[in-house]
Amino acid sequence: MTKREQSLATPYLQFDRTQWAALRDSVPLTLTEEEIVKLKGINEDLSLDEVAQIYLPLSRLLNFYISSNLRRQAVLEQFLGTDGQRIPYVIGIAGSVAVGKSTTARLLQALLSRWPEHRSVELITTDGFLHPNKVLNERGLMKKKGFPESYDMHNLVKFVSEVKSGADYVTAPVYSHLIYDVVPDGNKVIKQPDILILEGLNVLQSGMDYPHDPHHVFVSDFVDFSIYVDAPEDLLQSWYINRFLKFRQGAFSNPDSYFHNYAKLPETEAIKIATQLWNEINGLNLKQNILPTRERASLIMTKSANHAVESVRLRK
């Protein structure tokens, strides 16, 4: 098969780092180095170059899509003879644990909110829609946290549906990584944002991923543009273990931390436990439930060492 035939056979346009960076055009970088430091995750090296070469072109693309969507809404309103109701544009960000979804989400929130249109951009993680630990324990699902059956899908779909319906305000539960649980009465209020970024393991999942659940509407049905942050599994495992070790020196030392008993472990023992957690939970979830959703994404960002994006695939 020739390169042209291969290109025609795939639903994606492929860009290497240099080709993608060229699509920035003249979009200015509105974030300072200090602001970028605050946005990055505990385990990531994030440079101004990475933001300029990868995330500015992405924010430019999203701005085009969002503007196009607003024009489409205006056409529909004109056809129906209705007054304009503000319908948020929903961006979904999926990928493995430790791949850097949260950093990508925070960066896009910062960049999109600084476009000349001064749009309001809200960010919600699907972690808040995990069942509380009490429920997971009762159902024997604590070792399946992050798997499809560990989520309150009814409430997650209800939340996204209400946002997409233009509700004046919608509440979302909040998750704490410190206590490793949903925060009781810790709701976050969303008030008709222009853009909602929804970040989580499961935003691309559909009915095929929930055979145990009879409902027929899924988060992915409400997502306007989806991003899958990808990386080879050996890198993901390495990043997960390194993140675990950094938490062991930091967050785990807090007496309120769910993982406080890991704080004083020797490094060799901590690595052993992190590897076990990866193999039995996170790596398994990646193979069974997360990776199979990758090809449903509008855009796939593939990372190499140091969390640097080396290629981008954009759905035609």
UniProtKB/Swiss-Prot annotation:
It is an enzyme of class 2 (transferase). Keywords: ATP-binding, Coenzyme A biosynthesis, Cytoplasm, Kinase, Nucleotide-binding, Transferase. One of its GO terms (molecular function) is pantothenate kinase activity. It catalyses: (R)-pantothenate + ATP = (R)-4'-phosphopantothenate + ADP + H(+). CDD domains: PanK. GO terms for biological process: coenzyme A biosynthetic process. The keyword Kinase applies. The keyword Cytoplasm applies. Gene3D superfamilies: P-loop containing nucleotide triphosphate hydrolases (3.40.50.300). It is found in: Cytoplasm. Pathway: Cofactor biosynthesis; coenzyme A biosynthesis; CoA from (R)-pantothenate: step 1/5. NCBIfam families: panK_bact. Belongs to the prokaryotic pantothenate kinase family. This is Pantothenate kinase.
